[in-house]
Structures are given as structure tokens and as C-alpha cells.
Design a protein with these regions (language model features):
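Feature captures the catalytic cores and cofactor-binding loops of soluble hydro-lyases/lyases
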Residues: 23, 32-46, 50-110
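Absolute protein N-terminus
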Residues: 1-2, 110
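N-terminal first-folded block
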Residues: 3-45
Length: 110
């Protein structure tokens, strides 16, 4: 499934624009601990996290994630959005909880 298809399935917005829309997603990972994310996120994943600071971009780049998904319509600072665009990292935002987004992604990828 591509990122564009996933966005339609889980009803979220791409706050960084059309970055990575054609990339294939293999799996997902949910964690708010950066060290846990670094240790466990697989390549070609989407990462669901409530963290919204600049360091999430370093983790996403290191692990080559397709997108970061922010739950509960939480706001992301413009400086983080701008840096994500510069680095080619997609950030999505959904109104659902992290649990609900995880379930939607899991079911969409099955």
C-alpha cells in the first residue's frame, strides 16, 4: 500500500504536503520513546507517535520511515514541518488516538 492510499484509508492529513506519496508501506510501529523507536522501527514503516519535536525527524531519517503519524490532531510546530519538508520526511496528522490509528493501519495493511 502506498502512503497516498493509506491517507485515504485512515482519514488523516499530510501536513508536509505530497512527500513520499508513492512510497510503499510494509508495516507500522507505535512508540513515544525515541530509543525504542530507533531499536525497533523497520524500514518502510509508518511511525505513530505523540512526540512532535525536531528529534523525531532524526529518528525517521535514520530508520528510513515512510511517514510519521501524529494522533489526536496534535499541533506540530512550523519549524518541525519546514525541516521535515527539507529532509523529505512526510508527517501526517489524524484526529484519532494512537491506538485507533494503529488499528486502522494494521487493518489496512492486512
Amino acid at each position: 500500500m502506498t502512503l497516498a492510499e493509506l491517507i485515504g484509508n485512515i482519514r488523516c492529513e499530510a501536513i508536509t504536503g505530497d512527500i513520499n506519496m508513492d512510497r510503499e508501506i510494509r508495516t507500522g510501529y507505535t512508540s513515544d520513546l525515541l530509543s525504542d523507536a530507533i531499536a525497533n522501527i523497520e524500514e518502510d514503516s509508518v511511525w505513530i507517535t505523540m512526540q512532535r519535536h525536531i528529534n523525531i525527524l532524526g529518528v525517521a531519517k535514520l530508520k528510513d520511515v515512510v511517514a510519521i503519524v501524529i494522533p489526536r490532531s496534535l499541533q506540530v510546530e512550523q519549524s518541525v514541518i519546514d525541516k521535515a519538508r527539507e529532509e523529505g520526511i512526510a508527517i501526517l496528522r489524524g484526529s484519532q488516538t494512537a491506538f485507533e490509528i494503529s488499528a486502522l493501519i494494521y487493518n489496512a495493511l492486512r
